[in-house]
């Protein structure tokens, strides 16, 4: 008998650092609280006031840039790809973005959840639908594409 805890995986910061090449200040996923094989994942970003982009976006009313929400989605998707295709031997390139929508601002103190679901995979091309949520409310969404390449071919 399997319950959700045994079927779904997670990734703490150390595992994310093994899966992704990103490092501070561009690592935008603090933890992955749920990974369902190569089908879906939920990544977490705890937004803090001392992140470098807030010094200029905007000093009097800091708002997380939308492009960084998209990057957090892409990094969560990249973790799915890296786990499935082999850590260390491949690179995951963010390829496409479609249907991006920004619904509400994300500010310091928010906890963003990146909900990423694989829509299709053909060869080394993966497509995902992504939602970013704060307190259960949709703040951004996009469809993104990724390409898996061997480090030898990169």
UniProtKB/Swiss-Prot annotation:
Catalytic activities: a (3R)-hydroxyacyl-[ACP] = a (2E)-enoyl-[ACP] + H2O
GO CC annotations, alphabetized: cytoplasm; membrane
UniProt keyword terms in alphabetical order: Cytoplasm, Lipid A biosynthesis, Lipid biosynthesis, Lipid metabolism, Lyase
Stored InterPro entries: FabA_FabZ (IPR013114), FabZ (IPR010084), HotDog_dom_sf (IPR029069)
Gene3D superfamilies: Hotdog Thioesterase
Predominant cellular place of this UniProt entry's protein: cytoplasm
UniProt EC number: 4.2.1.59
CDD domains recorded: FabZ
GO biological process, one term: fatty acid biosynthetic process
Primary enzyme class: lyase
Active-site residues from the entry: 57
Name of a matching Pfam family: FabA
MF-aspect GO terms: (3R)-hydroxyacyl-[acyl-carrier-protein] dehydratase activity
Entry-linked SUPFAM superfamilies: Thioesterase/thiol ester dehydrase-isomerase (SSF54637)
Subcellular localization(s) per the UniProt record: Cytoplasm
NCBIfam families recorded: fabZ, PRK00006.1
Function comment: Involved in unsaturated fatty acids biosynthesis. Catalyzes the dehydration of short chain beta-hydroxyacyl-ACPs and long chain saturated and unsaturated beta-hydroxyacyl-ACPs.
Family: Belongs to the thioester dehydratase family. FabZ subfamily.
Name under which the protein is recorded: 3-hydroxyacyl-[acyl-carrier-protein] dehydratase FabZ
